[in-house]
A protein has these predicted regions:
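Low-complexity, Gly/Ser/Thr/Pro-rich intrinsically disordered linker/tail segments
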Residues: 132-141
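Short, polar loop/linker segments at the starts of domains and inter-domain junctions
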Residues: 18-21, 42-49, 120-127, 153-166
């Protein structure tokens, strides 16, 4: 299932994926992993632990970590992980959600549930405080741009080497590994694998 279809079908829905502890933010992520990424969700703990366990076999098979910095702009389908946050019992929980791709270096939007312990279903929220937030980018993705996506074999190349067609499957192998300034605007590139070759996209 595509990210877009997932949002359309489940926006506003209260998802209790594991039928335990009611509607939790991590339930939405398990649902996302199952429906969109096509993987079997595992229980790894509270929300903040998705980042702390980013190098575990389970997480690293699904995601590539994106450590937040001043150039970071979350992409569609990225999972944000907030390390801060506690429940009513004083237990550290953190928070987690799925980014829309709308935003810049100052704010971003994401779908999440049980924000602030309210028990709400899948709802869109705007985030401006990034102090304890990092991201997990899905390792395997499909090109969503109808016109395709330009791939560059070299960091300093000004001319693209390939046009990766719409709906093609790529593997992200490194995130935010290269930055390029064009007309006073900084663009950040990931490195991917496509048909056995590596490209900056």
């Amino acid at each position: 299932m595509t990210y877009t279809k997932w949002v359309k079908l489940y926006k506003g829905t209260k998802i209790d994926y594991d039928n335990a502890y009611g509607v939790q933010c991590v339930d939405l992520i398990k649902h996302y992993i199952k429906k969109v990424l096509g993987a079997t969700p595992q229980s790894i703990g509270n929300a903040y632990q998705y980042w702390e366990k980013r190098n575990s076999k389970y997480i690293s098979n699904l995601f590539v970590p994106v450590k937040n910095n001043k150039y970071t702009i979350p992409k569609t389908g990225d999972v944000f992980v907030r390390s801060s946050g506690y429940n009513s019992k004083g237990e550290r929980t953190g928070h987690i959600g799925v980014c829309t791709g709308n935003g810049n270096t100052e704010y971003f939007y994401a779908y999440e549930q049980n924000s602030g312990g309210t028990g709400e279903g899948m709802t869109l929220h705007r985030h401006t405080n990034w102090s304890s937030i990092n991201f997990l980018r899905p390792k395997y993705q499909y090109i969503t741009a109808k016109s395709g996506l330009h791939g560059y074999s070299k960091r300093k190349g000004n001319k693209h080497n390939i046009l990766i067609p719409y709906a093609s499957k790529i593997q992200i192998i490194e995130t935010e590994c290269y930055r390029k300034e064009v007309n006073h605007k900084t663009y950040t590139f990931d490195r991917c694998m496509y048909k056995g070759k590596k490209y900056y996209i």
